[in-house]
């Protein structure tokens, strides 16, 4: 947290369930990723004996716009796509891209995967994702409802069906995400039909 700012830190959960906040100077994402890798190898905090045990690195990306409707392996084209969407989520996507490049610099032969937070909502129809503003705003500036917290909504909707012992397809579900942000999603037959964001 707070990469590039004063008082940067990493929160870890130890094997016994206790939690620690470790302060560390992280002037950039490469230093932040390097520190996380060090923690993964630390006998107290980590779970690895060698970074060679890492088969792939996953990144949760906040904004995939309408370019990314599912998770994908990072390629030059994927990086360019994420970069093209920085204007839609400047605080998040720029940091995500820097994180991808940092991992690539430190572990160039390790595959990376992106999980787009709004991809779960890509099944919404235009009547649900378009705002009541001139259509030109959508065409020119990509102003629309994208949906967020998709990884949470996907998990909760599947978990609710497991808990209730019902088939995911064929259900009408409303999910609520309340964390650092809050949103709701309406899901029908396993597809998002509307969202509050």
Predicted feature residues:
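N-terminal glycine/serine-rich phosphate-binding loop of ATP-dependent small-molecule kinases
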Residues: 1-68
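Glycine-rich phosphate-binding loop of actin/hexokinase-like ATP-binding domains
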Residues: 120-197
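Predominant activation on well-ordered alpha-helical scaffold segments within soluble catalytic domains
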Residues: 33-38, 97-104, 153-161
């Amino acid at each position: 947290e707070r990469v590039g700012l004063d008082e940067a830190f990493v929160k870890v959960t130890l094997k016994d369930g206790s939690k620690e906040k470790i302060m560390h100077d992280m002037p950039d994402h490469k230093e932040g990723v390097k520190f996380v890798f060090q923690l993964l190898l630390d006998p107290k905090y980590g779970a690895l004996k060698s970074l060679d045990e890492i088969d792939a690195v996953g990144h949760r990306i906040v904004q995939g716009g309408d370019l990314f409707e599912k998770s994908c392996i990072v390629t030059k084209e994927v990086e360019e796509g994420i970069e093209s969407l920085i204007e839609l989520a400047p605080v998040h996507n720029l940091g995500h891209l820097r994180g991808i490049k940092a991992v690539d610099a430190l572990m160039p032969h390790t595959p990376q995967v992106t999980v787009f937070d709004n991809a779960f909502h890509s099944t919404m129809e235009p009547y649900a994702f378009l705002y009541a503003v001139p259509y030109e705003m959508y065409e020119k500036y990509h102003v629309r409802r994208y949906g967020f917290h998709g990884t949470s909504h996907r998990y909760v909707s599947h978990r609710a069906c497991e808990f209730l012992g019902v088939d995911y397809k064929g259900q009408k579900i409303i999910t609520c995400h309340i964390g650092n942000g809050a949103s709701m999603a309406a899901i029908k037959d396993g597809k998002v039909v509307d969202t509050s964001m």
